[in-house]
Design a protein with these regions (language model features):
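N-terminal export and membrane-targeting signals
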Residues: 1-5
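Periplasmic polypeptide-binding modules associated with outer-membrane biogenesis and secretion
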Residues: 6-35, 42, 51-101
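Envelope-exposed proteins and targeting segments
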Residues: 23-25, 36, 56, 60, ...
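Flexible glycine-/small-residue-rich
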Residues: 31-33, 87-91, 169-171, 179, ...
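Extracytoplasmic/secreted envelope proteins and their assembly/folding machinery
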Residues: 37, 41, 57, 61, ...
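Solvent-exposed, non-transmembrane alpha-helical starts
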Residues: 52-53, 94-97, 132-137, 176-179, ...
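Extracytoplasmic segments of membrane-associated envelope/inner-membrane machinery
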Residues: 88-161
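Extracytoplasmic/luminal low-complexity segments enriched in Pro/Gly and acidic/polar residues
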Residues: 180-214
Length: 214
């Protein structure tokens, strides 16, 4: 009867949804720039053949835990066979020098890598505070406000408090930033000033409405 037909329809639908017809055959990684997309895909190899409806977030999380550069991710099932993994990478702000070498960190102080040689294009962070200190947090906000290409020109950033951040560019130019307040405006003012006055040796943008140049 009708009830039997409906039951068969439901059972058939479940069999299709949870069976091999809707299993993972393609894994698409989106959002990687510093990470090797192939390595991330390989780490999720165990998901191939798993029905899309049975892809377990905790299993995926465990597979991605070995990539410290991943800040967050999301999963999207695209029937019949595609699993899309959207990655949000951590933004490195610079390196901290220690006896073990040069440690690349993000704005939260998460260690992304350690190497014996200083990575190119990464500013050296000089501060006595740890990752939870006001000065480190302020440094992170200031560096992240800079355009990526300009950030690569920063050789060193120092701060003894949250109110005396200073940058030294690879050209030797010194820029006094002050606090992390108005960082977006300070970033705009600094980059424009450096572009207009490439021979300046010192730029104070702590009060972005009244820049001091020498």
């Amino acid at each position: 009867g009708i009830a039997g037909a409906l039951l068969l329809l439901v059972v058939g639908s479940l069999a299709v949804a949870y069976g091999p017809l809707f299993s993972v055959k393609q894994i698409t990684i989106i959002g990687t720039s510093n990470l090797d997309r192939g390595e991330v895909e390989s780490a999720l190899e165990a998901q191939r053949g798993v029905p899309l409806a049975f892809v377990d977030d905790k299993t995926v999380q465990a597979s991605l835990a070995k990539f410290p550069l991943i800040e967050s991710y999301s999963l999207e099932a695209r029937p019949p066979h595609e699993l899309v993994v959207r990655i949000v990478e951590r933004t490195p702000i610079g390196v901290i020098e220690s006896a073990s070498g040069f440690t690349l960190v993000d704005a939260a102080g998460v260690v992304l890598s350690t190497s014996s040689q200083r990575p190119a294009g990464r500013p050296l962070i000089v501060t006595a505070g740890d990752a939870a200190s006001p000065e480190f947090i302020a440094i992170g906000r200031a560096i992240r406000s800079l355009p990526e290409d300009f950030r690569a020109r920063v050789d060193r950033v120092t701060a003894t408090s949250a109110h005396d951040i200073s940058f030294v560019l690879d050209s030797g130019l010194e820029a006094f930033w002050g606090s992390a307040e108005e960082s977006a405006l300070k970033s705009l003012v600094l980059t424009q000033t450096v572009a207009k006055l490439p021979n300046a040796r010192h730029i104070d943008v702590s009060a972005p409405g009244a820049v001091v140049i020498s």
